[in-house]
Structure formats: C-alpha cells, structure tokens
C-alpha cells in the first residue's frame, strides 16, 4: 500500500511529465538546472590567483574601496592598486614598512608604517601625507569606527591598541598581557573590536571601553589579519598557510588550505596557500582578497601574489 510520501512523489512525477511538454516550463526547468549546477560547483569556498607574481618586499595589509579596487601594501616602500580584473599599478610610494591599511570616511587610504611608527594618509591620486608621527609602536592593522571616524591601530611592538581621533590626536585605548604582537583588527556590527595576534594563535575581543578578553583559538601558529563580512570573521593563518571562518559565538572552521605550503588554486583543503597575510572583503558578492608571500623568507628577490577567495553560498 502506498504511503503519503509515495503519493507525493507520484504527484510530483505527473506534474513533471505534463510540465515537460510546455515550452515555458521547459525553459524554467533549464534555468533551475543551471542554478542547481552552479550551486553544486560553488558548494565549497575556493581560491584563485588574481595577479602574477609581484616582486617587492613582503606582505602588508589589504583593503578594498567601494568600486572594488584592491590596495595591497608590501611591508616596504609601496602600495599597489589592483583592479578586480587583476590589472596592477603602483598607487603610492615612499612608505616605511607599509603594513595594515583601511579607507577612511573621506575615501583616503590610511596606511600604517611599521618601521616608521606612523600612519600616513594617501589621497585618491596616490599623494602621501603624514597623519600621525608619534605615539605608535610598530603599528599594523587599522580599523575605523564609521560613526565617529575614530581610527584604531594595533601596535605590534607595543602590545596595545591606540585610538586616533579625526584631528590626529593619539590616545591609549587598550593594553593587555593577552596581546602578543596584535596584528589584524576589525569591528563587528556592535562596536566591538576583534584582534588577532601574530606571535600566537589567539583571537581577542575588545569591548567599546577597551576591556580585552579571549575570544577564539585559531590554528596552531601565528595569525595575520582578519575581516568581517555577513556576521562572520575571516582570518589568515599566516604561519600555517590556511584561512579560517569564525562566527560571532566563537566557533572556528577552516575553509581553505590543509597546513601545507604552496600556491595551488582550488576548493577547501585541496587549495594551497603560502603565508597569507592581508585580507579584505569585496563591496559586492561573497568575495575576499588576500596577499601571500611566495618564496622562502630568506630568498631574494622577495615575491608576493594577490588571490581572490569566493566564499561558499550562505546557508
């Protein structure tokens, strides 16, 4: 005797058969089949190389503007500008250990200078001007409060977070023994800051009053940078060559790489990465951009590459 599920399946088959003879319905079925095929291909997060190898210094921060241009610092003298199609040019020069960066509310690029203990402002034409020249100690990651315009900088050498007012005044915002070369820094949508350490595998939460607390443990080694997109953080595991996703409740999931170093495009654990560091989100779609250090830390010339991550479909 047929059960309810059998009746439902039989009804579906009859409707499917009658639909097949309708040209409009066949067109709809074709569209749906293409959508399902696309969804199956995009079932896993995947990565592809966006640029050819760039000869330079090393890997600093990455940020993306509102029209999709990617700005990549080389931890040396330069910031590169790369279009979403992969065309690249030098955007700015004359920096001193160009590390983390972010675009402020005026559309200018704020660029940390690790060796110069400073932050510079770079306009849309690539003109570099000093912004902060004192009060920082090995600045790396930059995060901006979009409501106030205040800037927060991770001081790697100083194991602290500095706050920079819109007029350039620097004050101490957070200091803790939990910091171990704080490197990447990002806001959530509630005004909390999140920081990842370069010298260990800890992700920390800093509340709006500057109180620091453990948040998540990621991978087994030091971390690079992080970005926040659609209620998720995406973190580069610099020393273990992986990318991780972290939810707002602290759940950690590896989405790219298997811990083995290399430059291999692909999905999930089949992809290979090489010292991924900077990471930033595209203004549209589920895309991220990272930079990676291609050669060994001692070999010359130093070379880097920029790659695009396409996140799996939202669940």
Q: What name fits each language-model region?
A:
Residues 275-315:
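Blade-level signature of beta-propeller repeat domains, shared across WD40, Kelch, NHL, RCC1
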Residues 77-78, 116-117, 158-159, 200-201, ...:
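Short glycine/acidic-enriched loop and turn motifs that connect beta-strands
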Residues 65, 104, 145-147, 188, ...:
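Structural WD40 beta-propeller signal
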Residues 45-60, 71, 75, 86-99, ...:
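Gly/Pro-rich loop segments of beta-rich domains
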Residues 82-87, 122-127, 164-169, 206-211, ...:
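Short loop/turn segments that connect beta-strands within beta-propeller blades
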Residues 27-37:
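Bacterial N-terminal signal peptides
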Residues 69-71, 108-111, 150-152, 192-195, ...:
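Conserved beta-propeller blade signature
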